UniProtKB/Swiss-Prot annotation:
Alphabetically ordered keywords of this record: Amino-acid biosynthesis, Cobalt, Diaminopimelate biosynthesis, Hydrolase, Lysine biosynthesis, Metal-binding, Zinc
Binding site for Zn(2+) 2: D99, E134, H348
Any one GO molecular function term: acetylornithine deacetylase activity
Gene3D superfamilies: Zn peptidases
Reactions the enzyme catalyzes: N-succinyl-(2S,6S)-2,6-diaminopimelate + H2O = (2S,6S)-2,6-diaminopimelate + succinate
Protein name according to UniProt: Succinyl-diaminopimelate desuccinylase
Pathway(s) served: Amino-acid biosynthesis; L-lysine biosynthesis via DAP pathway; LL-2,6-diaminopimelate from (S)-tetrahydrodipicolinate (succinylase route): step 3/3
Enzyme Commission number(s) from the entry: 3.5.1.18
Residues reported in the UniProt entry to bind Zn(2+) 1: H66, D99, E162
Subunit structure: Homodimer.
């Protein structure tokens, strides 16, 4: 028997939507939603396609996701072409299968089944879809949220279809994410000949103690919802490439993944106080990718947990680990936000895949969440 979730996922994978190119995915999704009576509002910015769609009135449950995917990498390493969906031994292979075209298909089919069974549902069902999540994330969900906030749009609940699961679909529900703050530090020295160090000032040597202290600092202890804040050096560069030149500058890039125990302002203040304590001449630029957010136990979390328990005979763990997601933008609307999606073992990898059976389960879970919140 044909599976509508699998078929739609295959259609989406066939469209090579390398971020921020949508490659026709949103037109396909929007047409399916429009046939259900959804109002479709295109909200594109620059090269990014976005749309906001809704049906009904009242308490609003939105499903959010992205149509863009990361590059496939070396095509020779793939068993099959990445944009030719291949079903083998119950697994669907293709770029975006797990992240996150499978989730999008599951959402759409869940909405189709829900509307068919409950055409006069009480609440409002909505979709927020973007083609700019995997790359810069500058013209995608963040811009749509800005527009919705400007007109005081109401959003009560939002389910993001990111691949949250670890071993079994539904074993983890993300009910928050850590904040992300990146520092680009330039430590200034004086360039010179390595044979005459007294005539130069090596910024690498001067910065080592400060960097050691940065790495060894315990920024907080976390809390019952978040692990302790972490700091990792991501890139470091100094020198001309010559073995006889003392560098004049040291460039260090480091990133914080921070809990609700800290704010980005506190982190900046502590870092700059440390650098000044070590007497460094420096300049530093900061980039905040997102604040931490948390959805406590309530209607949405409980609905997601019950949906998983109904179909999987397991109780999902609530976690806030992992990277950032567009949930960080949607949380600004005051909505309860969770992430529930496929197993993430192969995302961004060669031979990305998802279980066909999991896609069907996921769609049923999404439908059950709709039934709990907007009937």
């Amino acid at each position: 028997m044909p599976c509508p979730v699998l078929e739609l996922t295959q259609q989406l994978i066939k469209r090579p939507s390398l971020s921020p190119d949508d490659a026709g995915c949103q037109a396909l999704i929007a047409a399916r939603l429009q046939a259900l009576g959804f109002t479709i509002e295109q909200m594109s910015f620059g090269d990014t396609l976005n749309f906001w769609a809704w049906r009904g009135q009242g308490s609003t449950l939105a499903f959010a996701g992205h149509t863009d995917v990361v590059p496939a990498g070396d095509l020779q390493l793939w068993d099959n072409p990445p944009f030719e969906p291949t079903l083998c031994d119950g697994m669907l292979y293709g770029r975006g299968a797990a992240d996150m075209k499978g989730s999008l298909a599951a959402m759409v089919v869940a909405a189709e089944r829900f509307v068919a069974q409950h055409p006069q549902h009480e609440g409002r069902l909505a979709f927020l879809i973007t083609s700019d999540e995997e790359a810069d994330a500058q013209d995608g969900t963040v811009k749509v949220v800005d527009a919705l906030m400007a007109r005081q749009e109401r959003l009560d609940y939002c389910l993001v279809g990111e691949p949250s699961s670890s071993r079994q679909v539904g074993d983890i529900v993300k009910n928050g994410r850590r904040g992300s703050l990146t520092a680009n530090l330039v430590v200034q020295g004086v360039q010179g000949h390595v044979a005459y160090p007294h005539l130069a000032d090596n910024p690498f040597h001067r910065a080592m103690a400060a960097l050691k202290e940065l790495v060894e600092t315990q920024w907080d202890e976390g809390n019952s919802f978040f692990p302790p804040t972490t700091m990792q050096i991501a890139n470091i560069h100094a020198g001309t490439g010559s073995n006889n030149v003392i560098p004049g500058e040291l460039l260090v890039q480091f990133n914080f993944r921070f809990s609700t125990e800290l704010t980005d302002v506190i982190i900046r203040q502590r870092v700059e106080a440390l650098l000044q304590h070590h007497g460094l001449r420096y300049r530093i630029d900061w980039s905040l990718s997102g604040q931490p957010f948390l959805t406590a136990r309530g209607e949405l979390v409980d609905a997601a947990v019950r949906a998983v328990e109904h179909y999987q005979e397991l109780t999902p763990r609530l976690e806030t680990t992992g990277g950032t997601s567009d949930g960080r933008f949607i949380a600004r609307l005051g909505a309860q936000v969770v992430e529930l999606g496929p197993v993430n073992a192969t995302i961004h990898k060669v031979n990305e895949c998802v279980s066909a059976a999991d896609l069907q389960l996921l769609s049923r879970m999404y439908q059950r969440i709709m039934e709990q919140l907007i009937l």
